[in-house]
Amino acid sequence: TIMLDAGHGGEDPGAVFQGRQEKDDNLKLTLAVGEKLQDNGVDVLYTRTEDVYQTPFEKAQIANEAKPDYFISFHRNSSPDANQYAGAEVLVYDKSGIKYEMAQNILGALGEAGFDELGVKERPGLVVLRRTKMPAILVEAGFLNTEGDNEIFDNNFNMIVDGIANAILGTLDMETVEEEPMYYRVQVGAFRSRENADKLLYELLDQDYPAFLLHDNGLYRVQV
């Protein structure tokens, strides 16, 4: 399970530039990445799906109560002067563990989508990184007050979403491989009909097999 957080919200717009508000970009990106992860079978939770205000402490508390495996917060950066800086960066509490791997993978994906890569940086003072009890990262998807970064964000939006989602999925796959090196699944049936797939699934579960259902390319696949 992954919890996604759209930074800011409600009365807190985050960065603002020429009528553009960071909170809106954050939510758009968060929901799009979440949908892509869900399409790939990941359980996704959100701190917010609407334009509501939460303090960083509340966001961390929501995560700690939900107990996801990872917490990823999406933001846009800003600089004192317009068009002063450009690029994407990913922030972590410290450079250790799976969160650091995921942060590097996401940064690489943002680079491929057109942003300058400003690096993975330690920010132990940030509440959503310090107060969360699970691996947590904060993504800064370009500078909101830099026109070139906004062009990348708008024109390459789907590439950004796909890249971030694939970076997350790739990191999860890596972790699974590391944890379960000798783990194989066997497909026992593929059906066009959900009803037939469910029937086999329940029969296997009744016999205590760890069976589950996948859906892809119009087929329901039962695996153990």
Regions picked out by a protein language model, each given a short descriptive name:
Residues 12-14, 147-148, 221:
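A short acidic, helix-capping loop that chelates divalent metal ions and anchors anionic groups
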Residues 6-8, 75-78, 140-143, 190, ...:
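Short, small-residue-rich loop/turn micro-motifs
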Residues 16-23, 224:
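Periplasmic OmpA-like peptidoglycan-binding domain that tethers envelope proteins to the cell wall
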Residues 4, 137-139, 222:
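Short beta-strand motif preference
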Residues 20, 24-180:
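Active-site-proximal helix/loop segments of hydrolytic enzymes
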Residues 6, 48-49, 92, 188-190, ...:
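Short glycine-centered, acidic/aromatic-flanked micro-motifs in structured strand/loop junctions
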